Swiss-Prot record:
It catalyses: a quinone + NADH + H(+) = a quinol + NAD(+); a quinone + NADPH + H(+) = a quinol + NADP(+). Belongs to the WrbA family. FMN binds at residues 10-15, 78-80, 113-119, 134. This is NAD(P)H dehydrogenase (quinone). Keywords: Flavoprotein, FMN, NAD, NADP, Nucleotide-binding, Oxidoreductase. InterPro entries: Flavodoxin/NO_synth, Flavoprotein-like_sf, Flavoprotein_WrbA-like, FMN_Rdtase-like_dom, NQO. SUPFAM superfamilies: Flavoproteins (SSF52218).
Length: 200
């Protein structure tokens, strides 16, 4: 079976929750899954005063270990319609892997959160996916076979480009059951794709 990394950055815990759901989905397809986060670059005193969630249990990833996985699912919240600098800085350090083609043909995917329904979900997903394409990765999104993103009965995240959640202007909204189902669906689809590509 395939080996999957769920790599995320979470300021207030929404993406941490989504990452766990993505991992659940990947494990349900038989994949071996690690959940890791990128380093926080905001000084701890400032992060604490801004109420960042600093007690996240996932270990911090290193760039060099990325090539050890068959699939990498990247999650980060939006910052003005793109991924935040914490994730951008981490991926920028993967130039050596890019130069060697170390990630060519591996499976990639993205998930995100925004404060509002129209707060940059798709552009943030694109900002992540663009990096993964430059690394030579094969992209898996969240197809419309996941019916949860089609509903008009509730405020819900989700796009064909990846699973999403809506956090609210003050971060007061947690991922809904539908959004977590979307994350699990995408995680499972990534793992199933990696299993096919890598002989699982």
């Amino acid at each position: 079976m395939s080996k999957v990394l769920v790599l995320y950055y979470s300021t207030y815990g929404h993406l941490e929750t989504m990452a766990q759901a993505v991992a659940e989905g990947a494990r349900s397809a038989g994949a071996t899954v690690d959940v890791k986060r990128v380093p926080e670059t905001v000084p701890q005193e400032i992060a604490r005063s801004a109420h960042f969630k600093l007690d996240q249990s996932a270990p911090v990833a290193t760039v060099t270990e990325l090539e050890n996985y068959d699939a990498i699912i990247v999650g980060a919240p939006t910052r003005f319609g793109r991924m935040p600098s914490q994730m951008g800085s981490f991926l920028d350090q993967a130039g050596g892997l890019w130069a060697r083609g170390a990630l060519n043909g591996k499976v990639g995917a993205a998930f995100t959160s925004t404060a509002t329904q129209h707060g940059g979900q798709e552009t943030t997903l694109f900002s992540i996916i663009t990096n993964l394409l430059h690394f030579g990765m094969v992209i898996v999104g969240l197809p419309y076979s996941f019916q949860g993103q089609m509903t008009l009965d509730e405020v819900v995240g989700g796009a064909p480009y990846g699973a999403t959640t809506i956090a609210g202007g003050q971060g007061q909204r947690q991922p809904s059951a539908t959004e977590l189902d979307g994350a699990r669906f995408q995680g499972r689809l990534v793992a199933e794709t990696a299993n096919k590509l890598f002989g699982g």
